[in-house]
Amino acid sequence: MELDNFFLAEYDPRNIDHKTVIIKLENADRKDKNLGDLEYHIEKINKRREYNRCNHAYISYYDDIPIGFISIYTENDSYQISYGIIQERRQEYLGALLLQEFSEKMYEVYPEIGNLTLTIKPNNEASRKLAKLVGFERQNTVKYTQRRM
């Protein structure tokens, strides 16, 4: 899937670049556990796709280099986004740019989506700031939503 500044490849566990991104994200996240078990998360997404076409896990490429993970999935009648940028590419505003472009693309591709949701742990200050920067509004201590324009 093409975005303005990124290319998204559907996650393939046989692709070494894809596996490397997931391993880097899980290793960087061991302390805070913001992303959780990504392999399990991806399995759940693939199972949910059988019932709803809006369930996908992607590896994001920037300048042809894999820099992160982003997914859309349905949970409790809402459309959730989960994302992560590998440690060595953080602090470059790639997360904000990726989230903004991905959100716009999801509204374009899936007209049934009325709003998107992020679940962000209270201790994840960087993601909370990023969500607000991209136009997500805080609903409670962990939930942020963005409505279709």
Q: PLM features: residue spans?
A:
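Conserved N-terminal entry element of GNAT/NAT acetyltransferase domains
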Residues: 1-27, 149
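Conserved acetyl-CoA-binding loop-helix of GNAT-fold acetyltransferases
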Residues: 91-106, 129-133
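C-terminal "cap" of GNAT-fold acetyltransferases
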Residues: 3-6, 133, 137-149
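Acetyl-CoA-dependent GNAT
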Residues: 28-82, 88
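Short alpha-helical
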Residues: 16, 76, 125-126
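Alpha-helical elements of Rossmann-like donor-binding domains used by nucleotide-donor carbohydrate transfer enzymes
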Residues: 20-24, 40, 97, 101, ...
